Amino acid sequence: MKVHKRKKFGCLPTLLIIVFLIFILNFLKTRYNEVSYYTDSPIDGISEIFNFGLGFDPDEYKTDDKRILKNNLKKEANSGNDKASWIVDNFDNLDDALIYLAGNDPDTIAFVYNYQNGITNFEFFPGESVLLDRKTPYFLQWDNRWAYNALDDKNIGFYGCGPTAMAMVLARLNGDISITPDIVSKDAESYMTYGGISWDFFSDEAKRYGYTISEIPLDEYELIYALDQGPLIVSVNGGYFTLFGHIMVIDSYKDGKFVINDPNSIRKSQKSWSYDEISNQIAKIWLIK
């Protein structure tokens, strides 16, 4: 009787095909997540990030301690955030600005991952970045619709807190949410400096849209009174909201606390803040009406 010898490595091609198919499926899944991150709706897209962020506390000051930042990112990675895992794996090769951003706020991890991997082509659609149910529309500077648009020597996602804050205010005053950060950033280009954005931009942009701007003294009751007249643009120093300098909007005063639209953080925008918590970080306040 003729005996058929089993061919050596007969199952190897099948295993290779299975491995290849798994790789392709994971790749397509990643690309789908990236492309659809903001395309279904602002809420559905951004709400995904709230599955993560378990190791971050919005009440903590921002830090430049890389040991703490890496530990924060590891917690994110361990919770199942693949983009955080990638940042941890490439931690030592990333610019400090990227590490400070992603390590201090999990909301920004997807932006950092996309930026570093050249995933910057996203569909534009109208509407706020997140619906927070307040007087001032909410825009994020790192919203994929405009985050990668050039501003100064980087982009809106990095340096666009000023024009994003101004876009929120103008959208509210005009009742027109089509006034988005990408539009206002074009006006801001010539005001960008090494330290951020010139404060002259806010007065000039307010006048460009037909509004007046006035400086408000740092006093709790002055802030409350001013908010009855319109939204406030606030420049802050290092603390809860930034390491170095930042621009954001105070939307209103409710139940003894200030409601803030932070263009760089959803979590810090969802928390209300007492005067004592933020007053020592405020550098300048403007009322636009």
Q: Which stretches of residues belong to each language-model region?
A:
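Juxtamembrane low-complexity tails/linkers enriched in Ser/Thr-Pro and polybasic
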Residues: 1-5
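Active-site signature of cysteine proteases
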Residues: 26-34, 43, 47, 238-289
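Extracytoplasmic/periplasmic, Sec-exported soluble proteins
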Residues: 153-162, 176, 194-198, 215, ...
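Extracytoplasmic/secreted envelope proteins and their assembly/folding machinery
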Residues: 163-170, 181, 185, 199, ...
